[in-house]
Amino acid sequence: MAQQKIDSVKELIYLSYANLAMAHTAVEKQQEKYGSFNYMIRARLFKGLKEGKMNMRSIFDDEKIKLQTGSICNYCGSKEHLALDHIFPQKFGGQDNAENLIFSCRSCNSSKGKKDLMEWMNSRGQFLPLMIIRRYLKLTYSYCIENNLIDKKIEDLTEMELPFKIDLLPTSYPLPIYLIMNAEEKISDIYKS
């Protein structure tokens, strides 16, 4: 996919979501690096989303994953000292509903505080599980649709007080060997060290 100028909020979310799909397929296939198949997925999805021929999947899928994952910290995989965390902080307009709530251990919850999820991810220097990023993107998209922000220019949103930081949406992802789908995959890694 050739570099193209992304101006609108909608295009930025679509680009981030298409790159997420690319990463998702590579992690699912346990690839060490991205290949032409992954790039093709990204290009087709981005084009399909832009042209209105494809849609982002429903948050219902993410709710099913949340229920299947069970009571673990969705960030680190810990089963200790769990609480509910708002993905979009209520302080900045995040809703108090199931779609915006996930389990978080005391340590991650305290570390994240009222920060934007992507801001917190960047400060940690470690990518979050892909399913959490996917949920974040879907919440961002829904918020923008509901508040008539989806067709705005990106710079119009950067100074607004929103429950997300539009300029921090991930548009590139690390190599698949450094990514995980869900926090539960980290539990075994914790005991190896």
Model-identified regions with their sequence ranges:
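Nuclease and nuclease-like effector domains acting on nucleic acids or nucleotide cofactors
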Residues: 1-52, 174-193
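A broadly tuned "polar low-complexity/structure-edge" signature
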Residues: 5, 11-19, 103, 110, ...
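Intrinsically disordered, low-complexity segments enriched in small/polar residues
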Residues: 12-15, 73, 118, 171
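Generic preference for hydrophobic/aromatic residues in regular secondary structure cores
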Residues: 12-15, 20, 82, 139-144, ...
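Short, charged surface segments at domain edges that flank catalytic/cofactor-binding sites
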Residues: 22-72, 131-138, 142-149
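Histidine-centered nuclease catalytic patch
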Residues: 72-128
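A detector for short metal-coordination/catalytic motifs
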Residues: 110-193
